[in-house]
Structures are given as C-alpha cells and as structure tokens.
Amino acid sequence: MPTVLIVGKSNVGKSTLFNKLIGYKKSIVDDKEGVTRDAVSGRVSYYSKTFNIVDTGGIFENPEDDIINKSKDLTLKMLNEADLILFVIDAKNGITSEDYYLADIIRKSNNDVILVSNKSESERRVQNNLPDIYKLGFGDPIFVSAEQGKNIDTLIERIVNVLESKGLSLEENLKEESQSIIRVSFIGRPNAGKSTLFNSILNKERVLVTPIPGTTRDSVDELVTINGRKYLFVDTAGLRRKSKVDYKSLDMYSNVRSIKSIENSDVVVILIDAIEGITHQDQRIAGIAENRGKATIVAFNKIDLIKNFKYKKEEFIDQFNEKLYFINYSPLIFLSAINKKGIDNLINAIDEAYKSLHYRVQTSAVNSAIQRMMAFTPPPKGLKILYGTQVDIRPPTFLFFTNGKKVPEFYQNHIRKTIRENIYPFVGAPIFLKFKSRH
C-alpha cells in the first residue's frame, strides 16, 4: 500500500493534520515543540481508495538534544522510503529559515511533494505570506485548516491523483484484511526495551531508542507479515505510576494511549526489564490486560546483561509464579531484543495465545469435566452447579447455571483450573466465568 509522509518543522500542525486525515485522534497534539518523536502511522480511506499516512517529528535545523536529533535522523531516513511527501508549513506565522532548510532537504530526496499550507483560516495572512510560500519552490500549495477541517477532501483528492499517476494501486479489501490480522501491543514500564524489540522484529529502525526512559510518547504501529501471517505490532509509551503523572502532562496522554492500545489488541506482550525484575507497576500492567480480556505473554528482556543467566533462569520463573500468579497461564519468554535472541519463540507464543483466545470447546466436554471435578471436590455447602457451556471467545467465556447460591472466588479458580487441565489449556488467554440462577 502506498505511503505518504507528513514532514515539516515543529509546531506547524502535522499531528493535527494526521489525526484529521485518518479520522480519529491517534497522534498526541500539544502546543509544546517536539511532542511527536516517533513516526506514527495510520490509514486513510477515501471512498474505495486507501493509503498509509505517517506523522513524523519536527525537523530542527540545530537539534537541542540527542532525542530530537535521533527523531530528525529517523525522519530524514524515511524521506526516501515514502511514495509521496506532504511538506506542511504554517500560513499563520509565515515562512522561516527552518522551512527553507527543510525545503532543501526535501528537494534532495527527489520525491514527489505536495506543499500543504496549514492554519489558513485568515485570508489576509495567507495573502501576506504568499510570496514567501512560492519561494520554497514546490508550486501551488493546498491551503488547509487541519483544526477546522478546511479543504481536507481537496488535499486527499490531490494525494490520490499523485499516487495513481505513479501507477500505485490504492485498492484494498480492508474488511478481509482486518479479519486476518493479529494485533499485538508491547506494554511495559519505561525503558524496558519495548522500542528495541519493536525495531528488532521489523528489522529496521522505526521508533527512537535511547537510554532515556520515556523516549516513546505515541503508540506506534506497523503491519508485518511473518511466515505468511499478518501482525499489527504496536510499540507503546512506558506506563508510569499514577502518582508520577501530572494529569495535564504529556505523560498522562501517553498513559491513556497505552491503555487504549491494550484495549485494541488481541495479544499483549508484557515486557519486563530482567535487571530490575517484576515491579508493582508490572503487576498493575498485567492486571489491566487481564481485566480487559486480552491474551498475555510475559517476556523478560535484557537477559544478555544477566551474568550466568542459564543458572539464574529458575529464579526468574519463580519470580513470575510469585508476582504474576494471576496470569500464570501466560507463556514465559526470555529475550535479548538488542541481539534479536528469543524473537522466534515470542512469535510462536503470540500465535498460540491468539489461537487460545479464539478457541471453542464442546459443551459435552465442559459438563463432563465439571461433573468429575465436583465429584472429587464438592462445591461449598448449599451451592449446586447444574451445567455449563462456552458462550463466547475473545476472551473464552463460560456460562454456568446454578441454584442461585454465590460461587466463591476460590471455587471459580478451581473451575478455571479444571477447564485448562482437562479440556483445553487456553495458553495465554484469560478465562471469564459467568453464573446464572436456574431454579
């Protein structure tokens, strides 16, 4: 599918334009400069035409820190990979030296360019800045207001025309594709190695990796085909403790996006920093994924930094069973994302967890196993479980009819254990139980 890259200096409204084009708020928008760091991608559907759109970090002529410099390098690298560039400028505040600097860089890419003059609400300001806009050398701009949605359809039509003139196909069966994609999010504390793992699986630098916790702010996704199977991998911002997050801060927005990514996933990979071990925040993250009915995989990363790891592996397994006992049905994977070790095992675990999430068992098998369970371990006094059946998938959900007595939590856990050990293991998938009175 063709890819369109949004490029411009900081704070010209690239992320607002991106969100308007894809039809929902995916890129974080804030008045501060340099909010977008990674390349955030989405899909634009316009009647029967579809294409990918990528929001990039603002390019500074003289970056002030290492993160902004790496963001600039990532954007420059993508200039030659895209099929079309949207060069976004600010019609409200006029053309600056940074715009001319960026125009020279874009020209060197020899790519097709559409000049987009954003913040064009004021006709007077547009007219005042028109001579400088044409000096950029990219011909007639399209004047838009991403904030108000002005001329967005005109911009999309221009994009479609340019892409089709290059012989690129914009036709795709979105319904068929969406049904076959496994959606996987990487969740964890800041600096657990999520972005390194994301880049290692993609086999290219797609998101920034630095030793500084919290480098990733947006949730960044990429569609990948591995062994004929499609995966949508999502790298998320590290989830910070609530007590450390100002409700008005960018970290708050990042936390919200990360939780939203969990909700939109089939499989959640909970990435643990092997050096620090499982923390209370990791437990909280696991609880969020379980409560939302997502398949989970627990992965210890950075094992390359653990001396004599093979002799300490059992310690990590014990730590998993002790601190993440409530998702002990999850596959446990050991990784070195930076060295690309353990990634094949991770992909296999994702496949197995996805299968479990969608698996259905026969009603006869459920009742046979539950009757045997009750014969060996009778329910609490006064409680009768009459029969049960699986009523849903994603997650596997079972409905049991009872005589109306409340089923205590310990006995619910016993039912789940019986299902896993005697019917189907549902590796990686939580089992939800419902109870209904039938007199």
From Swiss-Prot:
GTP 1 binds at residues 8-15, 55-59, 118-121. PROSITE patterns: G_ENGA. Pfam families: KH_dom-like, MMR_HSR1. Residues 359-439 form the KH-like domain. GTP 2 binds at residues 188-195, 235-239, 301-304. Residues 2-167, 182-358 form the EngA-type G domain. GO terms for biological process: ribosome biogenesis. InterPro entries: G_ENGA, GTP-bd, GTPase_Der, KH_dom-like, KH_dom-like_a/b, P-loop_NTPase, Small_GTP-bd. The keyword Zinc-finger does not apply. GO terms for molecular function: GTP binding; ribosome binding. Keywords: GTP-binding, Nucleotide-binding, Repeat, Ribosome biogenesis. Associates with the 50S ribosomal subunit. GTPase that plays an essential role in the late steps of ribosome biogenesis. Belongs to the TRAFAC class TrmE-Era-EngA-EngB-Septin-like GTPase superfamily. EngA (Der) GTPase family. This is GTPase Der. It comes from Thermosipho africanus (strain TCF52B).
